[in-house]
Amino acid sequence: MEKIKSFTDLIAWKEGHKLVLNIYEITNHFPSKETFGLTSQMRRCVVSITSNVAEGFSRRTTKDKIQFYTMAQRSLTESQNQLLITRDVGYIKMKGFKNLPHRQLS
């Protein structure tokens, strides 16, 4: 196992980054009326996941690390909710929905 030297070596960051790229691709196809609504909210939310993982990695104390990793988990949960809404309003089809790296979603 390789030594973790950077936040980019963390599995959580790598998976989160894949999600960011997926969400940006998906939201590129949303209706323009969602530019300042769901599109903006989803993008901010997934960027928050990887940003909090990165910031948590740089923190010195375990307490601080846990705080930022917990915020990343909260943002992930929020993004799961947004993906369910996106599916339910018809902005994404089930096939595309199932291909997302959100294995916890049904």
What are these regions (language model features)?
Residues 1-106:
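Amphipathic alpha-helical assembly/interaction segments
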